[in-house]
Amino acid sequence: MNELTERAERTTTIAEATEHWWIADERIGGAQSDSYSVYTRAGVIFVDPLPLTYAAADRFPAVSFALLTRGCHQRASWRYRFEHGARVLAPRGSWGLLTEPDQHYVEGTRLPADFRAIRTPGPEYDHYALYRPGDANILFVGDLVTRRDSSSPLELSEDTPRLRPGISRDSLASLLDLEFDLLCMSHGGYIDDDPKGALVELYERTA
């Protein structure tokens, strides 16, 4: 989706060197949309970045990269490129981008700060999860797993009609071999209390 007019007024630290911000997104009926930042040796990295107020954005005088899990999560990436120097990385095959990203990626592309791209088709063909190992392993799942807000149950993405039935659930299964301490969704916030258990429960519930 494109950039909103509403901007988040603050960020919250949710793990060491990791921050989160969110808005009630009028484009999707007021459901929660979320973004994250990770401080790394390669600089500050934003994931699916929503707009911040100028006061909140002052926390980030320089942003090295904006990583997108899918093209429609470009959100405020281009503003962060222009104002903060961010390089925008988007999946190859992304559609609807307002301009050309600095780099396209696929599974296996070397990403900054040891981020790993994992192709997870379902919401669309060129959809990715991003895995970042570290003192706390973080899994960003984009739109594969969402919820309306932080108090709502997890939902698995519907399969895009042109993709084979069950592909979203297969993508979810591919993530269950990973070890992670923090699950970050692009809609519905994050889970830091048994995040893998939450995905296992969702997988079993959607059988």
What does each model-identified segment do?
Residues P51-S94:
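Active-site metal-binding motif and surrounding structural segment of the metallo-beta-lactamase
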Residues N2, E6, T13, T18-H20, ...:
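Metallo-beta-lactamase
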Residues D102-P112:
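Short acidic-hydrophobic, aromatic-tinged amphipathic segments that line or gate anion-handling sites
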Residues A57, A76-W78, G96-H104, D149-S151:
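Short, charged, surface-exposed secondary-structure boundary motifs
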Residues V63, H84-G85, P101-D102, E179-F180:
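Short, well-ordered alpha-helix to beta-strand connector turns
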Residues I23-F65, E100:
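Pre-active-site segment of Zn-dependent metallo-hydrolases
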Residues A8, G30-Q32, T99, Y105, ...:
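Residues that act as N-cap/strand-start positions at coil-to-secondary-structure junctions
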Residues T12-T13, D34-Y36, E107-T109, Y128:
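Residue-level detector of beta-strand structural context in well-folded domains
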